[in-house]
Amino acid sequence: MEHLPMAFNTTNPLIQVEDDRTGLSVETLKRALADNLFYLQGKFPAIATKNDCYMALAYTIRDRLLQRWLNTFQTYLNCDNRVVCYLSAEYLLGPHLGNNLINLGLWEPVQQAVEESGLSLDELIDIEEEPGLGNGGLGRLAACFMDSLATLEIPAIGYGIRYEFGIFDQEIKDGWQVEITDKWLQLGNPWEIARPESAVLVKLGGHTEPYTDDQGNYRVRWIAGSLVKGIPYDTPILGYKVSTANNLRLWKSEAAESFDFQRFNVGDYYGAVQDKMSSENLTKVLYPNDEQIQGKELRLAQQYFFVSCSLQDMIRIHLSDNPTLENFHEHFAVQMNDTHPSIAVAELMRLLVDEHHYEWQRAWAITEATFGFTNHTLLPEALEKWSLPLFGEMLPRHLEIIYEINQRFLDQVRMKYPNDGDRLARLSIIDEAGEKSVRMAYLATVGSHAINGVAALHSQLVKETILKDFYELWPEKFSNKTNGVTPRRWMVLSNPRLSNLISSRIGDGWIKNLDELKQLEPFADLAGFRQDWCKVKREVKQDLARYIHTRTDLVVNPDSLFDVQVKRIHEYKRQHLNILHVIHLYLQIKNNPNLDVTPRTFIYGGKAAPGYFTAKLIIKLINSVADVVNNDPTIGDRLKVIFLPDYNVKFGQRVYPAADLSEQISTAGKEASGTGNMKFSMNGALTIGTLDGANIEIREEVGAENFFLFGLTTPEVEKTLAEGYQPWEYYNNNANLKAVVDLINSGFFSHGDTALFRPLMDSLLGQDPYLVFADFQAYVDCQNQVGEAYKDQENWARMAILNVARMGKFSSDRTIREYAEDIWAIKPVVIELEDLCPDGQCLLISPNK
């Protein structure tokens, strides 16, 4: 025993993990970095790649996280507090390293340790692959919420799917989006820890059969057609300058039996691994294309898989410290992030009734008290519905349970609204019109004690439109929780120059209490501060200009107005309205070469769903316009158009700080909230936008005079459509619009091919469901105001400062506090690191536990 290092002295009842794992000094960090490079990567510095060095640094930082993570877990086990479990199909986390350095407060010592080791921290941070676990705002919101939950010291577990290939990497070839496999895991993920000992089995397919149990009770048994194993992978999510590190648990699918030795022995080599291949497909990619029936089957199986794994995991955790599930809802508050996890309502009922033999009424009371449901969309196509044949084939027991839930629910409705058959049809979880289907948003609504929207307008529209009848039935269930974003990633990490400038004037308390930004307001009137502000902005714009040059070879003028629209490509987000304005500007300059226009750089980014042809055609149009404009010598620096491929969190961290103008131009009433609008405003961009989503609340906070408003309101949109909207009339009566559309149709941007953009133009001229033509002139006029305003740089800077100063409401910390108080009934639990680690540098572990 005397030859063992002190850390492994098993004669001591308390094992002291050596300081290199937890120490925070520069020398300790350098030593840990070298050790991890040698012992974990197996490399000498002379032969180590940059990725080896990144991995070694990541493991060094992860060691510091593990100390906090395990202390958090131990504290939660020892307290009787409720835990929020967040069910989300997406977590758009972004790279971990930089964020963890910010939250640990270790940026400076780590930077020094890395530089003294002959490396560059910026280069190592830039190497990290972005986790391919999300697509858009839904996943990024989940990531911001996880950050805020930990920062506010609220016990939480995030549950989701460990996608092997994420959504896709986007490349642009000949102007078209091309989807490339996102191999984000190919070089390893140092932040996760596999927990195969906590694997669970998930049933799919098969049939059900009734039976009578030993007590004479009627029961139903689900005989599965196949079994899939769920393997959890855990990632610590650390709060900002607290000791709380909550758990993100993501599930990977594997075959229950991955290799059939008998089939292999008789030469059936493919058959021997067939189960392995089909099972692992469940967690290969995010949102598989569901145009074909196989894609629909995979999506439903994927959603059910992660929900079942997560609920089984919660039950296992609960029963480890409780004799029954009677108080399950007192220990877990489960929040469903949109409709993807809504099958959880039926699954918890199945687990309670079939597996744990609860009577229906008691099981339902537990279920309803457990769940909350966040609605994120008003678009009918995004409100998931599954056809009964598909649903019944894949989840036969759940369909029976949903029928029972629906029957009991409609019985209640009949009692309150007798002789109202139309209302019953509108409220039924089963849609009887056309192909019969299960309405998942309705299942989530019926099975939850709380339903919320994500912006004031959105929540109101939820109550007035898609869930109107439910609101009339249960008004007390509905509330609004306006979204927010974390200032740690979107200001401190993304924009350190601006963050340091702000902190130099008002201190750094705003990082945890964003309302303190209000203290900036008086500085907007100080010429010296405005000068410092503009200096920071120009430096950040120069950074983005260099990045654009690296990616595209284009040289852009950092003194031009950076006009930015980066988000998922969708018709309702109206990237095509934006590019129509670009073409209008181009025509103005071509027709009047001496025109005094504010130089602009239009920057686009975003992905189109693989099966969404119109969105892909919009990307092609943007790139085709860019090709013409950027190569026209008569235009020069007055107009540049850039589409930067593969928009993700990393991309966002570059572009949000550099933007002058934030494009938030969705059709009023279509965007639930939006969070990009908040990130832009927090970084000093002014907004041009409609009265939609959180734009309304941003405008209320920053002041109407600091917001460029245009377009029809939601009631006006509804009225225009109801009166028989004729986009052709707008085209005929607006010379500017007609000139733009005619130029596109002439083949000017498509090498003479008049058919290329015809589907998009025909759609706008014929239907224009998102009122692009109706809002075109108002948008052009508002953009003219923007151009004039930008010429007065002093006043523009003042407006930008006030935008930032008034963004306190839009921290995700505020949002999470509201959820915790109004829906989850959860209080913070402070993690005292020194209780388990008296000197703050070690972790005490009992070998008997």
Curated annotation (Swiss-Prot):
Enzyme Commission number(s) of this protein: 2.4.1.1
Molecular function per GO: glycogen phosphorylase activity; pyridoxal phosphate binding
Gene name linked to the record: glgP
This protein's record includes keyword Transferase: yes
UniProt xrefs under PROSITE patterns: PHOSPHORYLASE (PS00102)
Species for this entry: Synechocystis sp. (strain ATCC 27184 / PCC 6803 / Kazusa)
GO cellular component labels: cytoplasm
Record InterPro entries: Glycg_phsphrylas, Glyco_trans_35, Pyridoxal_P_attach_site
Protein name as annotated: Glycogen phosphorylase
